[in-house]
């Protein structure tokens, strides 16, 4: 199977699974401003599950999905671009011919603030961004609304051809748009 180029735009909800369908879906890029849109092309919220490969020796891998032939980790260094204001984000970075050679790398999983982006904030109660912008619901601010754009090339194993492949993002702070090979897959 050809290599898979994965790009994601993360803005500022824990995302369960975004899956590709044959129908073409185009983002409006207004989803994150619309209180009525929680997801586009995302599985319904559900408990965690994982399908081990047939005849996989579950005792040998101790039911650890990361050791399964059906698991591909997205952990590692990704190309990364961070901006302070949402209107500064690159709007065409999902194109397969986009030049990200000037972008830095970022460890995934990773936290922006711990890795030098944004302002480190610890809040055990309340709202982490309190006082940073005018509270004007349902309006979402453009200024001081940090956006991270991620790019990575991965190889899908040849024996996955014809299988349903699900992208699982265990912890996205706010919104995510996902493209694969330059094609929009979903938003959550």
Task: Describe each PLM feature range.
Residues 2, 21, 123, 129-131, ...:
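Generic cytosolic/nucleocytoplasmic N-terminal low-complexity/intrinsically disordered segments
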Residues 75-147:
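Core domains of carbohydrate- and sulfate-ester-processing enzymes
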Residues 52-55:
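Activation corresponds to long, low-complexity, non-globular regions
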Residues 1-24:
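Bacterial Sec-dependent N-terminal signal peptides
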Residues 23-39, 43, 48, 60, ...:
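Accessory beta-strand-rich segments of carbohydrate-active enzymes
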Residues 71-73, 160:
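Extracellular/periplasmic catalytic domains that process cell-envelope and extracellular macromolecules
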């Amino acid at each position: 199977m050809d290599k898979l180029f994965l790009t994601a735009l993360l803005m500022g909800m824990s995302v369960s699974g975004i899956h590709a369908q044959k129908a073409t879906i185009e983002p409006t890029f207004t989803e994150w401003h619309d209180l009525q849109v929680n997801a586009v092309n995302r599985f319904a919220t559900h408990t965690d599950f994982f399908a081990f490969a047939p005849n996989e020796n579950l005792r040998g891998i101790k039911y650890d999905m990361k050791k399964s032939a059906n698991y591909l980790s997205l952990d590692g260094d990704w190309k990364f671009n961070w901006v302070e204001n949402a209107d500064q984000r690159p709007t065409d970075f999902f194109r397969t011919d986009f030049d990200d050679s000037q972008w830095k790398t970022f460890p995934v999983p990773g936290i922006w603030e711990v890795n030098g982006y944004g302002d480190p904030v610890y809040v055990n109660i309340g709202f982490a961004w309190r006082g940073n912008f005018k509270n004007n619901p349902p309006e979402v601010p453009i200024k001081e609304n940090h956006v991270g754009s991620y790019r990575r090339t991965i190889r899908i194993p040849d024996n996955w051809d014809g299988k349903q492949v699900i992208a699982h993002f265990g912890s996205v702070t706010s919104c995510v748009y996902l493209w694969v090979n330059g094609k929009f897959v979903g938003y959550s």
